């Protein structure tokens, strides 16, 4: 699997990736954790609280655990995010290999 930088794909990049055996996986809108936004305006706790309110079943999450635009890396929020989602009844699984080999994710 692969994720296009910025989530931007074209028909050509998707064809090229498929020819190389890759399936593009895009994150869900609620799955953008905001961790590339400036820390002074979007502190980790605010991003964590927003994620815990917004994420729904089946969402694919995307996080940069350390990025130049943040003075406070988001990585320390990963454990509270997973714990909070589990406390809300979420489960975590590996992506099924069979659906990836067919070039799509099964729902």
What are these regions (language model features)?
Residues 2, 24, 61, 85:
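Conserved, mostly hydrophobic/aromatic
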Residues 6, 55, 65, 86-89:
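Sec/Tat-exported extracytoplasmic proteins
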Residues 8, 12-52, 89-101:
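His/Asp/Glu-enriched short active-site or ligand-binding loop at hydrolase and phosphoryl-transfer sites
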Residues 69-107:
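C-terminal domain-boundary segment and adjacent tail
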